[in-house]
Amino acid sequence: MREEKGVYTLLEACSILEKKKLSFSCHFVGKWSDIAQEVFYSKIKEYGIFNCVKAYGAKYGSDKLIYFKQASLFVFPTFYHNECFPVVLLEAIEQGLACIATNEGGIPDVIDEGITGYIVEKKNAIVLADKIEFLIKNPNLCRKMGEAGKKKFLEKFTLDKFENRLKDILLDILKAD
């Protein structure tokens, strides 16, 4: 896990939600990177969120898919400057999850504001917590956003769609010569 992926912002948002006595759990899945496990767990202790936050380390393939299947919402508060087009968001919408993320790189191409999820201000735990709380308290809307995200994935982001777009681009280049 990397600090620039918004880990500490999400932990702070979880602390805000815990103080409001909201019932939720937040699961972190990802390789330990510039954040040591000890530091991560000391933040959890500092915020008093042991009961609602868990970390599982790196998971791949079907092991990672289990976590998407168990989730009702995906949160990605990144401010990583090389975020380009995060595959993890495509994986989340493919599984029918509403997403909350930041306006970094190609994220606005994946998340349609208010339709497939929400785009929030970077490093703002209060706004992030508000959006998470809103979707937890509105599960039907959260589910509809997830369905809209899955539809968008099938319309724009499958391997077949990618291959067809690439083929069209290459044909256009050949025609231009």
Describe the role of every protein-language-model region.
Residues 127, 134, 141-156, 162-165:
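A short, well-ordered alpha-helix in the C-terminal region of glycosyltransferases
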Residues 79, 97, 101-108, 122-123:
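Short glycine-rich donor-binding/catalytic loop of glycosyltransferases
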Residues 58-59, 66-71:
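Short alpha-helical donor nucleotide-sugar binding micro-motif in glycosyltransferases
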Residues 113-114, 118-125, 134-140:
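Conserved acidic donor-binding segment of nucleotide-sugar-dependent glycosyltransferases
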Residues 2-16, 83, 126-127, 160:
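A conserved mid-protein helix/loop that constitutes part of the nucleotide-sugar donor-binding site
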